[in-house]
Structures are given as structure tokens and as C-alpha cells.
């Protein structure tokens, strides 16, 4: 995924929420995405852990 992609994010106890990627940072353990959500327009960071399906919080929207 890259900047300006439409995504959905997994949050605690609720349905996936739509957002837009503002920034991407790659790490050896995975990737951090700064995602603008409706109630966080300046963005909030989410981490996708490499190699662990349970550690995937950001997915590209269809």
C-alpha cells in the first residue's frame, strides 16, 4: 500500500473502519501506516506485523 490509498483498519471491538494512508514507514518487523480516519483526520499510526495474519491491522479497501 502507498500514500493516498483507501484502506480499512481493524480496531478494538468494532467493525473495520475506512481511512486513507497519509504516510508509510517500513521496518524489519513490518510496516507502519499513518491512516486518516473520520474522527482522527490528522492520522493515527497502525502497525502491520510481517508474517503474522493476526498482526495485520491495515488492509487495502476494495
UniProtKB/Swiss-Prot annotation:
UniProt-listed Pfam families: DSRB (PF10781)
Protein name: Protein DsrB
Family: Belongs to the DsrB family.
Regions annotated as coiled coil: none
InterPro entries registered for this protein in UniProt: Dextransucrase_DSRB
Domain of life: Bacteria
Amino acid at each position: 500500500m502507498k500514500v493516498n490509498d483507501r484502506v480499512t483498519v481493524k480496531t478494538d471491538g468494532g467493525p473495520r473502519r475506512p481511512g486513507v494512508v497519509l504516510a508509510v514507514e517500513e521496518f524489519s518487523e513490518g510496516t507502519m501506516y499513518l491512516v486518516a480516519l473520520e474522527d482522527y483526520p490528522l492520522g493515527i499510526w497502525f502497525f502491520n506485523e510481517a508474517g503474522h495474519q493476526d498482526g495485520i491491522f491495515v488492509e487495502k479497501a476494495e
